[in-house]
């Protein structure tokens, strides 16, 4: 019979605790969780305050027990729930004093969903408690996604309003962006050293692999987050919702910025409400975002010079290099849509100067090159050689950004398939030669050796 919760358990002989801690830790390190269970349980029951390892390894031990239980898993699931509660009681912070409450509570809520323990509402409330009390340590992309999926399920059941759904979507989306930016900052330190030819330590290489794994996870779950709400976040739904709440929020810069951002992202910016949102936002809080949106309005009015002036003002107002990179990329996309390839590349390169790990900027440039194949080069061979440059640029995207790696590699393979074949190179007899493109690309490629 398993026992839960430590409050009612009398503290026994603590002399065996250090030995049992050492025993279960050694078993757990080699994933022999069945052997680790009993000494771990004795430490948890007798001296839970001894070491945080009791809770970190305990989470893994109980996950193993739940997965491999031959009969009813309920007892182990309940024990896991109690473990999270006791974890917060005994080790709510790290050694340096940073709160772990958000991490622990979100792990508990995730386990409730994974093991179908408790109701959807109960899991939501614990997720929300974690997010409100300590968002800083609530960093798991899976749990952030599950938090919103739980929110969405409650909305579909009628327990949450449309407004509550969108508010939570904005909050969680912003958290995803924050964590992705934090990862980019760390990854770019290593990328900059590599690009400069500086030696990279083995620790930095290991860290880079961890960053890349996390970048991919955040990218995947962020895309899934958007997919959940795609139908609800149509212009037909957004505009009436924002119109209804505009008067009450026209001096709320956070609300105005979120509404304008969502309308821009969903291409609802042709509606007059977008103009009202942007003007209200810029009136109470002139910022990089509001200047960018004013640039959009100028663009839509056909005033390209006025738009560019606002875009540049936006960049001047923005002090953070990663937010600046995001704005530069959006401007690059606008110019690409207009067919202004050289300007689009220029802004994409400026984005990369601020965030070297922004793979989508390299992909945009690769796409610009591929779209110019018929406009560059004097011969058919030279025109098709542009695809080598496009493929090279797409591969660079894959190398710096694991979040787009799969798509970028497919793009590169597609471009390489359109480039001259080995037979073409043999016929031309130009293996190893350099081909320079004198069009707007103003770059060169080396013909592959046979």
Segments (PLM) and residue ranges:
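Generic helix N-cap/helix-start motif at coil->alpha-helix transitions
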Residues: 12-20, 51, 99-107, 137-144, ...
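Terminal, low-structured helical/coil segments at or just beyond the last alpha-helical repeat
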Residues: 396-450
């Amino acid at each position: 019979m398993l026992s839960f919760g430590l409050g009612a358990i009398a503290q026994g002989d603590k002399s065996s605790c250090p030995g049992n801690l050492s025993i279960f830790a050694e078993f757990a390190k080699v994933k022999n969780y069945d052997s680790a269970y009993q000494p771990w349980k004795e430490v948890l029951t007798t001296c839970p305050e001894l070491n945080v390892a009791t809770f970190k390894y305990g989470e893994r031990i109980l996950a193993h027990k739940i997965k491999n239980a031959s009969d009813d898993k309920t007892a182990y699931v309940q024990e896991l729930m109690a473990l999270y509660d006791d974890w917060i009681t005994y080790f709510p912070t790290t050694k340096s004093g940073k709160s772990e409450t958000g991490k622990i509570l979100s792990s508990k809520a995730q386990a409730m969903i994974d093991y179908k323990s408790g109701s959807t509402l109960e899991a939501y409330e614990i997720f929300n408690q974690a997010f409100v009390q300590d968002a800083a340590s609530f960093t798991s992309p899976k749990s952030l996604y599950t938090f919103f999926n739980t929110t969405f399920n409650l909305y579909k059941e009628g327990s949450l309003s449309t407004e509550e759904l969108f508010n939570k979507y904005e909050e969680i989306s912003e958290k995803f962006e924050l964590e992705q930016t934090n990862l980019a900052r760390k990854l770019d330190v290593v990328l900059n050293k590599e690009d400069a030819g500086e030696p990279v330590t083995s620790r930095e290489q290991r860290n880079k692999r961890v960053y890349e794994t996390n970048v991919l996870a955040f990218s995947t779950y962020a895309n899934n987050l958007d997919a959940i709400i795609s139908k609800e976040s149509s212009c037909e739904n957004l505009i009436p919702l924002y119109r209804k709440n505009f008067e009450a929020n026209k001096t709320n810069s956070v609300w105005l910025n979120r509404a304008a951002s969502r309308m821009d992202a969903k291409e609802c910016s042709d509606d007059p409400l977008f103009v009202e949102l942007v003007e209200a936002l810029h009136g109470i809080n002139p910022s990089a975002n509001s200047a960018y949106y004013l640039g959009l309005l100028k663009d839509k009015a056909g005033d390209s010079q006025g738009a560019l002036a606002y875009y540049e003002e936006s960049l001047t107002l923005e002090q953070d290099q990663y937010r600046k990179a995001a704005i530069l990329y959006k401007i690059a996309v606008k110019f690409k849509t207009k067919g202004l390839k050289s300007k689009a590349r220029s802004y994409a390169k400026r984005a990369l100067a601020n965030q070297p790990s922004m793979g989508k900027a390299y992909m945009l440039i690769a796409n610009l090159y591929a779209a110019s194949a018929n406009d560059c080069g004097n011969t058919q061979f030279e025109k098709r050689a542009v695809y080598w440059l496009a493929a090279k640029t797409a591969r660079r995207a894959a190398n710096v950004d694991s979040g787009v790696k799969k798509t970028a590699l497919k793009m590169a393979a597609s471009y390489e398939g359109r480039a001259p074949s080995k037979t073409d190179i043999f016929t031309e007899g130009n293996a190893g030669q350099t081909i320079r493109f004198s069009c707007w690309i103003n770059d060169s490629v080396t013909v592959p050796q046979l």
